[in-house]
Regions:
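DPxDG-like acidic metal-binding loop motif
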Residues: 44-99
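N-terminal subdomain of lithium-sensitive/metallo-dependent phosphomonoesterases centered on the IMPase/IPPase/PAP
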Residues: 1-55, 199, 212, 216-223
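Residue-level signal for inorganic ion chemistry
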Residues: 14, 25, 58, 87, ...
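Short strand-turn-strand beta-turns centered on an Asx-Gly dipeptide
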Residues: 77, 104-105
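Short glycine/threonine-rich catalytic loop with a Thr-x-Gly-x-Asp
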Residues: 14, 61-64, 149
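Generic detector of well-ordered alpha-helical packing
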Residues: 15, 38, 54-57, 88, ...
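An extended, acidic
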Residues: 109-223
Length: 223
């Protein structure tokens, strides 16, 4: 395990996995671009660009937890059109195209939650909330929901898309963290924005939820 400049961990597995993914993509789609967490950008202005996070949840991976996964997005002219979350140990493969979302080939949808006081709220790391966003507002949200847990990284979005949670929040995100999530959450019938309620493709944070409560969540977090 090594540390990046931001002190986040990176493993040999992260690097080897991304190298293999890049090799496959360049063989099959030589004109496509690639943006990866470990090795940066290659032809990022191409019409089609793959965005790769070989191990999302590296801290979980090095701890032996099973909730880590791989994130893959395909962008067309800068917009994500396909997103994948793969949990290899859990044998769960989630794919979305903004219209539908499939888990191991079967359609899944976000559950219909119309009231925040009935919602399950997830986030990746509560310590990052106050560092990047408004801690007091987040604390108020946690008091209003039915259940709050730190089940994060891509596993939190998997739980949201498959109907086991209602709100997933990350106060800071990189492009390789967020792009795959957008077609998945949209395809599962949810809503996904940044912390301010804007286009998540141009923001650096994520708020994803059931459509019925999204505007209220944004209001509580930001306004």
């Amino acid at each position: 395990v090594e540390s990046k400049l931001d002190s986040s961990p990176v493993t040999v597995a992260d690097k080897l996995a991304e190298e293999k993914m890049r090799e496959i993509i360049m063989k099959e789609f030589p004109t496509h671009g690639i943006i990866g967490e470990e090795f940066g950008s290659d032809n990022p202005d191409a019409e089609y660009v793959w965005v790769l996070d070989p191990i999302d949840g590296t801290k979980s991976f090095i701890s032996g937890a099973l909730s880590f996964g791989t994130l893959i997005a395909l962008l067309k002219n800068g917009k994500p059109i396909i997103g994948v979350i793969n949990h290899p140990i859990l044998n769960e493969f989630l794919i979305g195209d903004n219209q539908n979302c499939l888990l191991n080939g079967s359609k899944v949808e976000i559950r219909n939650c119309s009231s925040i006081n009935q919602a399950t709220l997830l986030t990746t790391d509560h310590l990052n909330i106050g560092k990047y966003q408004n801690q007091n507002k987040f604390d108020e949200l946690t008091k209003k929901v039915k259940l709050y847990r730190n089940w994060g990284d891509c596993y939190g979005y998997y739980l949201l898309a498959t109907g086991f949670a209602d709100i997933m929040i990350d106060p800071i995100m990189n492009v390789w963290d967020s792009m795959a999530l957008i077609p998945i959450i949209n395809g599962a019938g949810g809503m996904i924005t940044d912390y301010q309620g804007n286009d998540p493709t141009i923001g650096n944070s994520i708020v994803a939820s059931s459509k019925g409560i999204h505007s209220e969540v944004i209001k509580l977090l930001y306004e």
